[in-house]
Amino acid sequence: LITTVLDITWEVGRTGKLTPLAHLEPVDFMGVTVKRATLNNYDDILRKRVGIGSRVLIRRSNDVIPEILKSVDDGEPANPVTIPTCCPACGARVERDGVHIFCTNSLSCTPQIVGRLEHFASRDAMDIEGFSEKTALLLVNEIGISKIPDLYELTPASFSGLPGFGEKRIGNIPVSYTHLRAHE
């Protein structure tokens, strides 16, 4: 299936790795509207000759994840993508390590902090029920959580007044955070 790349942005993960994300002209593919696809890394962009405005061949890897296979345009892209010189989230400098690009600001780059908190609270780690990326972002932005040990200081009162935390949800917190403290 062929579509057009409208933009390419860079997302920051919990390890600080920047991953290029292609925003596509929406296209119906196997019953799903595909609007975005990963490009893995900068070398992948170059190898596939993808730029903004490129017409690209896409597929759904394992019938799930949208993937750009290649540009169907002749020659190099008219609007090539450049390597970012700073983190799109926090503005810190970036470093290249092989094919990957990393934000150097691991202490205060919000997407990295949110990603680490979410990973720590996930089912495969501490299994804190109801803790999501949205919750982590709220804790970082509203309470100032910046590292995993800060989670151990939270009490139900910490959540009072936060958007999405009514009495019922706050009442469920002790169960989850008692579980967290049990792993100390």
Language-model features: where?
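Long, charge-dense accessory insertions within large macromolecular proteins
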Residues: 1-37, 42
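Cys/His-rich short segments
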Residues: 69-125
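Short, charged beta-turn/beta-strand-edge "cap" motif at the junction between a beta-strand
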Residues: 57-66
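A short amphipathic alpha-helix within small helical-bundle interaction modules
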Residues: 128, 139, 146-162
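Conserved small/polar residues in nucleotide/adenosyl-binding loops
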Residues: 178-184
